[in-house]
């Protein structure tokens, strides 16, 4: 994108963010997260049976699944179920979501049960994995809060909040929260998952058009940290009315 200049918002600004809690009635926790034109439904379902590899260990598990509706993109995507297998991208993203959430949960306090996270992209315009992580935390917190209020858990096993955002270099300019045109035409980009205390869970970085320096990486991380701070406040606001 040699002539691209972002004009719709500042280089260090998020897209318009909206998180609607309790978006679906038939699950323990849910929300719709909207990051600009990217929209993801996130749900959390409690299963009172821990996975087999944890039986008898007095600890729980959090896992995630991720998918995109066929019409979530400009050209219809074939359902992965009809292809008979998940793509490598899908498997990578759902593992990332699961890892990100497990990093902020005390599994012993969760007890011998698992929480199943589902992230379904209904409209995609870049940043679906980061939006999924940010929304999934809200759904998880709602589900866990229900376990506590119902007396099933004596204390909340969630240690702190977690959120994620992208940043990238487009036409030599570091930008926060890339939309699809920016993401597809960037020089380099990163996806960063960070806790409320500022600890990094994961950094995924790739040079798409040109390698980037450690100094540029530092600028992208700083941009992401700013954006994640704002996303954490959106999460708090959504949970305060949940």
Swiss-Prot record:
Pfam families: RNase_PH, RNase_PH_C. Its EC number is 2.7.7.56. It catalyses: tRNA(n+1) + phosphate = tRNA(n) + a ribonucleoside 5'-diphosphate. CDD domains: RNase_PH_bact (cd11362). Phosphate binds at residues 89, 127-129. GO terms for molecular function: 3'-5'-RNA exonuclease activity; tRNA binding; tRNA nucleotidyltransferase activity. InterPro entries: ExoRNase_PH_dom1, ExoRNase_PH_dom2, ExoRNase_PH_dom2_sf, PNPase/RNase_PH_dom_sf, Ribosomal_Su5_D2-typ_SF, RNase_PH, RNase_PH_bac-type, RNase_PH_CS. GO terms for biological process: rRNA catabolic process; rRNA processing; tRNA processing. PROSITE patterns: RIBONUCLEASE_PH. It comes from the Bacteria. It is an enzyme of class 2 (transferase). Keywords: Nucleotidyltransferase, RNA-binding, rRNA processing, Transferase, tRNA processing, tRNA-binding. Phosphorolytic 3'-5' exoribonuclease that plays an important role in tRNA 3'-end maturation. Removes nucleotide residues following the 3'-CCA terminus of tRNAs; can also add nucleotides to the ends of RNA molecules by using nucleoside diphosphates as substrates, but this may not be physiologically important. Probably plays a role in initiation of 16S rRNA degradation (leading to ribosome degradation) during starvation. Homohexameric ring arranged as a trimer of dimers. Belongs to the RNase PH family. This is Ribonuclease PH. It comes from Neisseria gonorrhoeae (strain ATCC 700825 / FA 1090). The lineage of its organism: Bacteria, Pseudomonadati, Pseudomonadota, Betaproteobacteria, Neisseriales.
């Amino acid at each position: 994108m040699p002539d691209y200049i972002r004009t719709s918002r500042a280089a260090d600004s998020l897209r318009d963010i909206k998180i609607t809690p309790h978006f679906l009635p038939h699950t323990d926790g849910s929300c719709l997260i909207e990051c600009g034109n990217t929209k993801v439904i996130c749900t959390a379902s409690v299963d009172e049976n821990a996975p087999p590899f944890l039986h008898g260990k007095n600890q729980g598990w959090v896992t995630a699944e991720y998918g995109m509706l066929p019409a979530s993109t400009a050209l219809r995507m074939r359902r992965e179920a009809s292809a008979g297998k998940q793509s490598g991208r899908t498997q990578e993203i759902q593992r990332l979501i699961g890892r990100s959430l497990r990093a902020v949960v005390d599994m012993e306090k969760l007890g011998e049960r698992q929480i199943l996270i589902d992230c379904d992209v209904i409209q995609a315009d870049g940043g679906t994995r980061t939006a999924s992580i940010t929304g999934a935390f809200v759904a998880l917190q709602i589900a866990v809060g229900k376990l506590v209020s119902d007396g099933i858990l004596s204390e909340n096993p969630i240690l702190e909040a977690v959120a994620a955002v992208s940043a990238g270099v487009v036409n030599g300019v570091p930008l926060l929260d890339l939309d699809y045109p920016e993401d597809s035409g960037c020089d380099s980009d990163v996806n960063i998952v960070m806790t409320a205390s500022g600890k990094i869970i994961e950094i995924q970085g790739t040079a798409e058009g040109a390698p980037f320096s450690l100094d540029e990486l530092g600028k992208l991380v700083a941009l992401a940290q700013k954006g994640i701070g704002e996303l954490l406040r959106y999460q708090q606001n959504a949970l305060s009315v949940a």
